[in-house]
């Protein structure tokens, strides 16, 4: 995995985690994740692409044992400064090296939030899913939040800017996305692609849109000063979240896969 996000590490929380849009999208993920955790016997969790550790800390505070990994040493350093929870361990790990860093460990759940897996090629994603199966306990689960190809917000945004070449950019491979000054090669995957890649080892349990009405984070400057509009969009999002078919049109989607 080439993208390290070292440059983005220092400013990531300010540019996404603590923003209005970032908080709303994260709370949507937590609402679904909380239900998954309550319905299953979960003790040990592996997080992939943990970034600055926001989700790992939240999970650890729910009394789960969490191993949180990221390829970026600077992201891991930022995360480690946030907490000293005994049931949380941060490690620098390249996702493409799995399962080598965990030769004797099994996890009940593997979690990856907000498009970390979009830094993989389709081939790498398929290999990750195969490797993840070997790291999970019997009936273990993958909970992944991924960016799809057909995000309506993005298409409308580029249409409004008359940037017609970018309207369907998510359908291309290795799209260069700027993340806080760092150019990251990004690939987008619709739910059907993920379920197909995972079909040998997993069955789908849950599929939900994340950010169908709530916009992408790069629109934060526009929406930050319009709290009433954000409130309306949030209410609409709660309705949209009931309809899995909207997932490929949202900014992200949450997919839960259970090991066969």
Residue spans of the language-model regions?
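Conserved class I S-adenosyl-L-methionine
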Residues: 1-40, 42-51, 58, 143-170
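Class I SAM-dependent methyltransferase SAM/SAH-binding core
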Residues: 52-98
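A short acidic, Gly/Pro-enriched loop at the edge of an enzyme's catalytic core
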Residues: 100-109
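A short glycine-rich, Lys/Arg-flanked "PGG" loop and its adjoining helix->strand segment in the class I
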Residues: 126-138
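Short alpha-helix
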Residues: 183-201, 207
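A C-terminal cap/extension of S-adenosyl-L-methionine-dependent methyltransferases
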Residues: 206-260
């Amino acid at each position: 995995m080439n993208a390290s996000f070292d440059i983005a590490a220092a400013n990531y929380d300010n540019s996404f985690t603590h923003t209005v849009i970032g908080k709303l999208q994260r709370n949507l993920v937590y609402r679904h994740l909380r239900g998954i955790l309550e319905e299953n016997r979960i003790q040990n969790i592996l997080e992939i692409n943990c970034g600055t550790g926001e989700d790992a800390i939240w999970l650890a505070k729910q009394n789960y044992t969490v191993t949180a990994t990221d390829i970026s040493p600077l992201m891991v350093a930022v995360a480690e400064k946030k907490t000293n929870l005994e049931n949380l361990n941060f490690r620098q790990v390249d996702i493409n090296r799995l399962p080598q860093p965990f030769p004797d460990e099994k996890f009940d759940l593997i979690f990856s939030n907000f498009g970390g897996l979009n830094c993989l090629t389709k081939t790498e994603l398929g290999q990750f899913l195969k490797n993840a199966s070997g790291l999970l306990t019997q009936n273990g689960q993958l909970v992944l939040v991924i960016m799809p190809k057909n995000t309506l917000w993005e298409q409308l945004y580029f249409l409004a800017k008359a940037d017609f070449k970018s309207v369907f950019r998510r359908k291309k491979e290795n799209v260069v996305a700027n993340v806080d000054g760092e150019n990251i090669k990004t690939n987008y995957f619709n739910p059907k692609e993920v379920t197909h890649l995972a079909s040998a080892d997993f069955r789908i349990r849950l599929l939900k849109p994340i950010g169908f009405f709530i916009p992408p984070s790069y629109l934060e400057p526009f929406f930050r000063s319009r709290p009433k509009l954000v409130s309306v969009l949030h209410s609409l999002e709660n309705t949209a979240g009931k309809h899995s078919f909207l997932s490929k049109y949202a900014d992200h989607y949450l997919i839960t896969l259970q090991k066969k």
